[in-house]
Swiss-Prot record:
GO terms for cellular component: extracellular space. It is found in: Secreted. Its main location: secreted. This is Alpha-S1-casein. It comes from Oryctolagus cuniculus. The modification Phosphoserine is found at S33, S99, S101, S102, S103, S104, S111. PROSITE patterns: CASEIN_ALPHA_BETA. Keywords: Milk protein, Phosphoprotein, Secreted, Signal. Residues 1-15 form the signal peptide. Disulfide bonds: none annotated. Mammary gland specific. Secreted in milk. Important role in the capacity of milk to transport calcium phosphate. The lineage of its organism: Eukaryota, Metazoa, Chordata, Craniata, Vertebrata. It comes from the Eukaryota. The keyword Secreted applies.
Amino acid sequence: MKLLILTCLVATALARHKFHLGHLKLTQEQPESSEQEILKERKLLRFVQTVPLELREEYVNELNRQRELLREKENEEIKGTRNEVTEEHVLADRETEASISSSSEEIVPSSTKQKYVPREDLAYQPYVQQQLLRMKERYQIQEREPMRVVNQELAQLYLQPFEQPYQLDAYLPAPWYYTPEVMQYVLSPLFYDLVTPSAFESAEKTDVIPEWLKN
């Protein structure tokens, strides 16, 4: 037991010593790296200052061109990915439409079989349609005929002149209208009626009473 405890203590002491040494190394390396970077920047500045302006401009232009090329490549890649995505969507839509159309075609033949019409019926259909059109025309003509008759009668009434209330035929002719020869025939029955005795006078003279007076 004592040996185990001693070994554990020794191991912990060694580990602490190693950790302390490593931390010191890192702290020493970090300032060295920062100092190296500062030295590099200074060297670049000196080199840039020694380079003429034309070379600087060319260098800057090349850098800008490289940046533009990189941007164009990125844009092309983005467009390519978008086109691929759209093509995938289009293909998926077409596949769904094809599946729907195939399913509908499977359903439609059963209905078309039920609705099959022979050729004879198809040839007879235009004749039936013509007959129906003729029947409709006749019916329309029959409906219009009474209206035409009424309109014609009204037109005749409007066109006919008003009759005069004092026509010569409405009254008996005056005696001076006829000639003397005609007046003989016209006046003779009147005088005959005045001369002939009535039924009462003949009955008184003959003393014969008619039967209808007896009652």
